[in-house]
Amino acid sequence: MEILMAVLAGIIFMAATYLLLSKSLLRVIIGTALLSHGVHLMLLTMGGLKKGAAPILSEHAKSFVDPLPQALILTAIVISFGVTSFILVMAFRAYQELKSDDMDQMRGNDQHE
């Protein structure tokens, strides 16, 4: 199962890299979100995919699952959601001002020529 998750994380990284290298600002933002999801999947895989009970003291559970990777990923998901929403608002504002989401048109003119 870990191999399948690692391959899936690699595919997500490839798609994110493709989107990050495009000229459209919206594609770059989607690529950034995909990259963060790939990192979340990689962290989950590195934490180990084990079956077990919740880490609550009880007499019936014999093996426990480590809660640290899940807590780390949950925190990273919340942070990436906040950053993505902030970047989307900034991109919308730039689109309102410039009437384009093309990265080459957003650069402006070079005044040193």
From Swiss-Prot:
InterPro entries: CPA3_antiporter_subunitC, NUOK/Mnh_C1-like. Gene3D superfamilies: 1.10.287.3510. GO terms for molecular function: sodium:proton antiporter activity. GO terms for biological process: sodium ion transmembrane transport. It is a multi-pass membrane protein. GO terms for cellular component: plasma membrane. Keywords: Antiport, Cell membrane, Hydrogen ion transport, Ion transport, Membrane, Sodium, Sodium transport, Transmembrane, Transmembrane helix, Transport. Its main location: membrane. The chain crosses the membrane at residues 4-21, 28-47, 67-89. It comes from the Bacteria. It is found in: Cell membrane. Mrp-dependent antiport apparently occurs by a secondary, proton motive force-dependent mechanism, but the similarity of several Mrp proteins to membrane-embedded subunits of energy-coupled NADH dehydrogenase complexes raises the possibility that there is a capacity for electron transport that could provide a primary energy coupling option for Mrp functions. Mrp complex is a Na(+)/H(+) antiporter that is considered to be the major Na(+) excretion system in B.subtilis. Has a major role in Na(+) resistance and a minor role in Na(+)- and K(+)-dependent pH homeostasis as compared to TetB. MrpA may be the actual Na(+)/H(+) antiporter, although the six other Mrp proteins are all required for Na(+)/H(+) antiport activity and Na(+) resistance. MrpA is required for initiation of sporulation when external Na(+) concentration increases. Also transports Li(+) but not K(+), Ca(2+) or Mg(2+). Belongs to the CPA3 antiporters (TC 2.A.63) subunit C family. Forms a heterooligomeric complex that consists of seven subunits: MrpA, MrpB, MrpC, MrpD, MrpE, MrpF and MrpG. This is Na(+)/H(+) antiporter subunit C.
